[in-house]
Amino acid sequence: MKLYSLSVLYKGEAKVVLLKAAYDVSSFSFFQRSSVQEFMTFTSQLIVERSSKGTRASVKEQDYLCHVYVRNDSLAGVVIADNEYPSRVAFTLLEKVLDEFSKQVDRIDWPVGSPATIHYPALDGHLSRYQNPREADPMTKVQAELDETKIILHNTMESLLERGEKLDDLVSKSEVLGTQSKAFYKTARKQNSCCAIM
């Protein structure tokens, strides 16, 4: 999972203006970096230009996903990431950056601004912090921990069963479980298998 670009733009009536951008092109060869960066700027501007105000969208291009958020006040943000990067985290980042940007940069500067004239140093920090969505987004971190716990539980249960042995056989042979518990297990098993087929 990787973020390559984080841009803040202004969607004007005549054209889209790049206000500030941060890039991570370290995974590209040295000679490709400036071209890749220019292409990401071009793509970001094009996506904002073709998006309506008040919309969020994700555009797939080969192995990359471009997430765009254009607010009703014409402020827009674009994240370019690989296709494994979670969309929810990308949109959380865009919302956070645009809220912060609108508080720190005067609205009068948006239509006439440029990366050289706009002072918003936090963008590079956001790009590097959100490289790992688990660390940046608490929900993603919790979900990953739950997934890991599920995997551990499944591995543990499978490792307890001997080769060729099934949990159903163990339940039916069990002397510890009462008749009612065995009936409950069988009913639950049938319901779960019924739902899995649907």
Swiss-Prot record:
EC number: 2.3.1.-
Result of changing residue 195 to S: Prevents farnesylation. Targeted to cytosol. Decreases palmitoylation by 13%. Prevents palmitoylation
Highest taxon in the source lineage: Eukaryota
Places the protein is found: Cytoplasm, Cytosol; Cytoplasmic vesicle membrane; Golgi apparatus membrane
Residues lipid-modified (S-farnesyl cysteine): 195
Cellular component GO terms held in the UniProt record: apical dendrite; basal dendrite; cytoplasm; cytoplasmic vesicle membrane; cytosol; endoplasmic reticulum; endoplasmic reticulum-Golgi intermediate compartment membrane; endosome
Proregion span(s): 196-198
Modified residues (Cysteine methyl ester): 195
Sequence positions bearing Phosphoserine: 159
Gene Ontology MF annotations: cadherin binding; protein-cysteine S-palmitoyltransferase activity; SNAP receptor activity
PROSITE patterns the record matches: LONGIN (PS50859), V_SNARE (PS50892)
Record note on quaternary structure: Identified in 2 different SNARE complexes; the first one composed of GOSR1, GOSR2 and STX5 and the second one composed of BET1L, GOSR1 and STX5.
Description of its domains: The longin domain regulates palmitoylation and membrane targeting.
Role summary: Vesicular soluble NSF attachment protein receptor (v-SNARE) mediating vesicle docking and fusion to a specific acceptor cellular compartment. Functions in endoplasmic reticulum to Golgi transport; as part of a SNARE complex composed of GOSR1, GOSR2 and STX5. Functions in early/recycling endosome to TGN transport; as part of a SNARE complex composed of BET1L, GOSR1 and STX5. Has a S-palmitoyl transferase activity.
This protein's name: Synaptobrevin homolog YKT6
Organism: Homo sapiens
